[in-house]
């Protein structure tokens, strides 16, 4: 993930109703951008071999898209994509970065002898003014489950303002996936919840015993708070492929050349996922994404490259997968079908976080249909 605007929505926008909330840029910077201004965070992404290999291959196997061209790197971070673009033959690279990481990007450009090509610009992509249109927009904008962080908004803004009509996007396409899985995470999180409640009950007893104040009236609220944290929040995990017990389904496809912010502000899908493993338990759904570097119809890639964050026997990426616990879990068998209705919207409190709702129902191979269950999950 590269860097760009997290933020609390202004009260005036909420009061007005209707359109998208206005973002407080200072709050956004404090909550989101600042994370990417640290080298340790950049190093985490630079050490992700799947990520690095995919972007490196996409650029150098398709050098014709870069040779002699003007490139815009949105959220350049350390500047690695800008440097590769220059090494692939770009005439000019504008590398936009909102944080002070911009200075490190300049240092790296100088150290790698591309400072005459790579111009690092510190500022918000929405505010930056370039002296010319660009042939290529490259960006590593993907967040957890693809759309967390909402950085793609800034890429869309850059595309609409600066990309030439025959320009290309790197990546050019993206997909979101959902799959049924087996996992012990639910038991682990339930145990954590009970430990937290046991600690709370001791606190209530001690507070009344030592200080004469009965806190028990807050027990219900405390439990609800912790149920949200332990059971209703998406869990980062690097799953093994054998934990996937059924057919994964695409729930969203994005064409980066044509997508609008309205199209990604809310995601809705209805999918049916056949179970492929007998006598097991559906404990959760897992979400991940992949992106593709295809160029465009008018200017296709010589070699298409895919970056996938699906469960992998060789280990995963820094994105991992997001696990959405289903409570209660369901006993399933091969031949059963899980039908899921899915909705994901941006949090009203922070447009970079996501609120999700899953309605799932089991259709057994015998013909029996279990009642639908609805659960809310928060991707924070």
From Swiss-Prot:
Q: What InterPro entries does its record include?
A: Arg_MeTrfase, PRMT_dom, SAM-dependent_MTases_sf
Organism from which the protein derives: Oryza sativa subsp. japonica
| Active site per UniProt | 140, 149
The gene name reads PRMT10
Repeat as a keyword of this entry, yes or no, is no
UniProt name for this protein = Protein arginine N-methyltransferase PRMT10
User: What are the BP-aspect GO terms?
Assistant: chromatin remodeling; methylation; regulation of DNA-templated transcription; vegetative to reproductive phase transition of meristem
- Chain intervals for the UniProt region annotation (Dimerization arm): 187-227
Its cellular-component GO annotations read: nucleus
Q: EC number(s) for this protein?
A: 2.1.1.319
Q: What does this protein do?
A: Methylates (mono and asymmetric dimethylation) the guanidino nitrogens of arginyl residues in some proteins.
Top-level class of the enzyme under EC nomenclature? transferase
Q: Which UniProt keywords apply?
A: Methyltransferase, S-adenosyl-L-methionine, Transferase
Give me the reactions it catalyses: L-arginyl-[protein] + 2 S-adenosyl-L-methionine = N(omega),N(omega)-dimethyl-L-arginyl-[protein] + 2 S-adenosyl-L-homocysteine + 2 H(+)
Q: Using the record's annotation, list all stretches that form the SAM-dependent MTase PRMT-type domain.
A: 26-357
Where is S-adenosyl-L-methionine annotated to bind? 42, 51, 75, 97, 126
GO molecular-function term, one example from the UniProt record = protein-arginine omega-N asymmetric methyltransferase activity
Which Gene3D superfamilies does the record cross-reference, listed alphabetically?
Hnrnp arginine n-methyltransferase1, Vaccinia Virus protein VP39
What interactions and quaternary structure are annotated?
A: Ring-like homodimer.
Similarity field: Belongs to the class I-like SAM-binding methyltransferase superfamily. Protein arginine N-methyltransferase family.
Q: Which domain of life is it from?
A: Eukaryota
Is Transferase tagged as a keyword?
Answer: yes
